[in-house]
Amino acid sequence: MTKDAEVEEFLKRVEDLDGKINKPPIVKKKPQHLSTTPIENDDTLDGNLVYKSAFNYEKSFGSKKPVGVIGLDKEDDRKFLVSEEDYKLLQKIKMEQQQQHLSERHHRHIEPVRHIIPDRHSKPIFHNEPVIVREESEDEAPPLPSRNRASSENVVKSTTSAPPLLPRRRYKDDITAKKLDVVSDNVNSSNKIKEMSSISDKNKSKPPLPEKKTFLKSLEDNKLTTSNYKDQDKGPELKPTRNVDFLESVQLKSPPQSPSKMKTIEEKHFKLNSPKKDGFIVSVLSSEENSRSSLSEKPSNEGNYHLSGGLTTKAEKKKPVVPPKKDIKLKDIELEKVDKTGKGGDGKQIEPEFQKIVLNKRTPPPVSKRKPSIPEALLKAQNLSKNTENKKSVAQSKESIDMLPKLNKKGPPVPQRKVSMPEALKKLESMKNKNSTTENVQKDNGEESEISDSEPESINNKLESVLKRANTSGQIGSKHIGHLPPRAATTGDLLSKKEPHTTQSLSHPNKSRSRGPKRKLPTKI
């Protein structure tokens, strides 16, 4: 099956689109040289940009003034008279300016090479330049790099100038040298002084011209290739010791001998004038490896170890001095026997001591109460005053009664309700019925009073009369429908019966009445 050309092109397009979508987003390249210097920022703040922009605008769009107005037109015909001194000064200044201009051309400021940091996605650049490898021989030295003119002048000056002086020694060196001279013999001290004077004379004389060195000899003198390494000081050997008492070890211990920090003068001069080795190869063969100092083996007997110089490896902990033990023989303390009977030899009962302490407390002496006589009491009774508490209470009660009307304030007057005609008619009928009932009651009461007047009043008769009055008042004042008499027909009822077709509107007695101020719900429940 061969694919069509159109299908292949379509598939290629799809693959290209997928590759573009799946690629990471392109990061914008940063500028190679960012202007982060504070000088440039200060220039912008000072307003140099504003000045430059205004100058450029005026130069491009401003009106061009003629040269004659400013006074810059040249006049070749004009001549000036100048003194001879001024003319020479002017010529001298011109010559100096020309020399400065020429020197600036020769000594231009070489800018430092800026190492450009490659971008994140950039590939490493490999310089495909051939590297020339020279076969180094022992006799021929490699060619030296070309020096600048300034560096060559400095070299010539150094050869002709006086040799460099040795660094001054510290004050401590002189003190140590004096101490060594006192200890040593007089002969040795005189020899040392002669050697020192000879060395100083040699240094003062001019050094000989440097001989031609081969490449291997120069490597010998190089500080980087050291032929012999100093033997590293191995740690002091540890020796096991017997278990010594703390006080004895302090007495036997010798004071720590501090090694002298400064070396003797002879050793220093010996190192300075030490003979050189026979070439680079011999020095390499004779060089020793920088071997590490091997640790000392762990001793079998565990215990306290000290150094050869008397110094211990670990700081010994000071043990407190323990006093010698005393042989204390404890004796059994025998307690005195107590008689259970609680009686002594005489047969008297012995009281315990704590009771005696309680009894010894101080008690106040008894005071005899004085009995007053009758005439004295009568005389003092006259001076007595009545109790005033009751009077105060009465006065307070009067004040409270006076304050009652102020506290019990009356509410606002209730507005009178307007009475309609049908209600007024109803009230009249009810009043008539009440008057008829009261008349009947009065008649009954009159009959009873006559009987009561005839008969003597007794307690039973009084009770009966009171009960009758209560019954009559209940019949009159009762609001039950059964006790009330039948209501008489009013004019309104007669009109409604005559006109059956007219629709009677519902009468709401509470709707038309004028209400007072609206009731507020209680806030504090």
Curated annotation (Swiss-Prot):
Residue ranges, compositional bias (Polar residues): 148-162, 251-261, 382-398
Biased composition (Acidic residues): 447-456
Stretches with biased composition (Low complexity): 285-297
Membrane topology note: Peripheral membrane protein
GO cellular component entries: actin cortical patch; plasma membrane
GO biological process, one term: endocytosis
Annotated segments matching region Disordered: 21-40, 98-262, 285-325, 339-525
Residue spans of biased composition, Basic and acidic residues class: 110-122, 171-182, 201-223, 230-242, 314-325, 339-354
Cell location: Cell membrane; Cytoplasm, Cytoskeleton, Actin patch
Amino acid composition bias (Basic residues), ranges on this chain: 510-525
Keyword terms, alphabetized: Cell membrane, Cytoplasm, Cytoskeleton, Endocytosis, Membrane
Function field: Cortical patch protein involved in endocytosis.
Name of this protein: Protein BSP1
